[in-house]
Amino acid sequence: MKRLKRVPDSRRVLFAGGWLRALKLTALALIILVLAGASLLTFMVFFTSAFKIKEINFSGNANVSAEQLKQLGGMDAYSNLVTMPVGRIARSMENNPWVKDVKVQRHLPHTVNIAIVERKPVGLFDYTSDAYLLEDDGFAIGKVPSDQFKELPRVYAGEVPAPVVGSKVSDKKVLDCLAVLGGMPQKLRDTLLMGNPFDGRGPVFVSRNGYNVVYGRPTQMSRKNEVLEAILTDVKNNNRKIAYVDVRIPD
């Protein structure tokens, strides 16, 4: 007995065909909307003032003025927030030795927010009339008259050549001295007047109260700082007179 061929349901065929047509029309409509949106956005970006830069905000800059940073970044050359080259601007600002890191962010529709991270000097490399601000890694931030930044410890330069601003000091003993200063809490570092990197015992400091601090190489610094803080607190609270403090072996 022969099987009868099943005739396709015309309603199903019509439904399938209609669904495909609807899908194609929807896709076409979406493409048109995307293209129209892109065209409108392009027009707004390049041919209107919809994204014109109206405000530039700086944060974190204490030693470099906003005006200096604007000039470094060439901000006057850019008027459009969307097309502004944030990477190039950041790199240009980082050419200033004070500037360690820059983050440039757009805040639509009209604002640029620029966060500055400045280098932090821990000592003043002293050459009598002139001095160099040094970071704890030996980076020379700037050259200043030696009577400025009196809150910073003076680091004896010895026979080490004056550094080039924007480069690092290479002398190992000086680097050890700076590492010690950088590893101290701010409150402890503020008690120091001078530092001698070239003492045979390692970095030795003169406090603002006149006694010496024999610190030694930058090892066990957390423990050394704790011991030193405890001794200085005791000296202050009990009005003791001392000639020196030796924390080379803190235990």
Residue ranges, per PLM feature:
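Charged, solvent-exposed interaction patches on well-folded alpha/beta domains
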Residues: 1-54, 67, 71-80, 88-91, ...
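Extended, alpha-helix-rich binding/interface surfaces that flank or overlap catalytic cores
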Residues: 58
